[in-house]
């Protein structure tokens, strides 16, 4: 199972604001782009992939929207608008939820009022954790561990205090090259590299 976490620190948990910020300063379109590149291939979808989108611009609690490739159906298309519509559906379903609650929106689509740190703590129990960092070891020079989970951010960098907690959880820093890339581009390159490793190329 491959997992991805996108920590979207500027992404609003209000569905209308999410829509308003497509192409705006919060760049909420990145959420759809990461979903598209993590879950789908040409004319198909990947198996055994999960993406967690953590939206943190909120008046109450962060929202973690989880999409499971093996379970999701009725997506409505592979385009940005269809994927944004799924996020809107999840956010609308989360209205009124208390802290650390879970709501199944539809098969393969879940929303939780859980923080990035709490989510990471859960995943650390059964996943090999990797954080994208330009100064990390090249992904081509390491052996990817079982059940890898790759941690990405939007245009707002990861805060230093999170770096300390990730270090305690054993998160490894890895690099995809010398250039800073969009999170969605990182997802594609990660998939490609693991595809090569698994195929023995």
Swiss-Prot record:
- State where S-adenosyl-L-methionine binds: 132, 186
EC number(s): the record gives 2.1.1.-
Q: Name one GO molecular function term.
A: tRNA methyltransferase activity
Cystine pairs: none
**CDD domains in alphabetical order:** TrmY-like
Source domain of life: Bacteria
Q: Which GO terms describe its biological process?
A: tRNA methylation
Q: Where in the cell is it found?
A: Cytoplasm
Pfam families (alphabetical): Methyltrn_RNA_2
Keywords of this protein's UniProt record, alphabetized? Cytoplasm, Methyltransferase, S-adenosyl-L-methionine, Transferase
* One cellular component (GO) term of this entry: cytoplasm
Family indicated by similarity: Belongs to the methyltransferase superfamily. TrmY family.
Q: Which PANTHER family match?
A: TRNA (PSEUDOURIDINE(54)-N(1))-METHYLTRANSFERASE
**What is the name listed in the Swiss-Prot or TrEMBL entry for this protein?**
Putative pseudouridine methyltransferase
